[in-house]
Design a protein with these regions (language model features):
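A hydrophobic, multi-pass inner-membrane permease signature
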Residues: 1-276
Length: 276
């Protein structure tokens, strides 16, 4: 038997490749985490220091003391509220498209096509509109914008998940005297739960990582963490420790969300892949 065809060798190669891929994806996160605790001397040391010799918690303390950490809370409010609104409206719209054929067969394609428009092409008209209404640097302004941009994606995704739910189950519930709202809450939502969570996670991440709209439409009160990070880049020098610390704070909510919803997320993505 050839050497590479032996079961033990093939298994070792698989584990080796898997380990290499894990290191490639995990190392940048580890390095970012270490930089957030390093002194400037350790950050620019050569050869590089693979870990912080003296952990500088002051990098994080400074963010909270100066109020910069509030930008993470701003991002959480904007992303969280817009995700909830988009999921409620988008799921109901998707249900209407599937069960009542609202707008015909081409409406869903038209809706998702709106999401393909590049944000940079419309950011200036939106800015002028927000100046007119006085929505610049406001929570409700960005929440409305994020919701509007998330709705096409939510409708498209939830349309596919709802189509997989047998119509007979809903008809049986209606025959038993349930209202359409009861059917939604007791039949459709529980059966599409994995799809709901998967869609919500990606919707949340879109709003959480937004930079362009937050940069143009905020000033001082509603700055998000993505915009705040750019304030640490200067013409003469960059505050790399603050950049790393703010980046760590900005990634924690996403990591925690994905960790708690991992089971539903994987199942929801798998359902979509099987359907496709």
């Amino acid at each position: 038997m050839p050497f590479l065809q032996r079961p033990g060798v093939r298994l070792a190669i698989r584990y080796g490749v898997a380990l290499a891929l894990v290191l490639i994806f995990v190392f940048p996160i580890y390095w970012l985490f270490m930089i957030s605790f390093k002194t400037p001397g350790e950050i620019f040391a050569f050869p590089p220091k693979w870990y912080a010799q003296h952990f500088q918690f002051g990098n994080y303390y400074g963010l909270f003391k100066d109020g910069d950490a509030k930008t993470v809370l701003n991002s959480l409010i904007l992303a969280g509220v817009s995700t909830i609104i988009a999921m409620i409206l988008g799921t109901m719209a998707a249900y209407s498209l599937v069960r009542f054929k609202t707008g015909g067969e081409n409406l869903a394609v038209w809706i998702i096509s709106q999401r393909m428009m590049p944000p940079i092409a419309i950011v200036f008209p939106i800015f002028l509109l927000y100046v007119f209404f006085g929505w610049v640097d406001s929570y409700h302004g960005l929440i409305i914008l994020y919701t509007a941009f998330s709705l096409p994606y939510v409708i498209w995704m939830m349309r596919g998940y709802i189509e997989d739910i047998p119509l007979e189950l809903e008809e049986s519930a209606l025959v038993d005297g349930w209202t359409r709202w009861q059917v939604l809450w007791r039949v459709v939502f529980p059966m599409a739960r994995s799809g709901l969570f998967a869609t919500a996670v990606f919707t949340f991440v879109f709003a959480w990582n937004d930079f362009l709209f937050a940069l143009v439409l905020t000033r001082t009160e509603v700055i998000t963490y993505t915009v705040q990070v750019t304030h640490y880049f200067g013409g003469q020098s960059n505050f790399w420790a603050k950049i790393a610390a703010m980046s760590v704070l900005g990634t924690l909510p996403v990591f925690i969300t994905v960790a708690f919803l991992q089971r539903f997320l994987v199942r929801g993505i798998s359902m979509g892949a099987v359907k496709g």
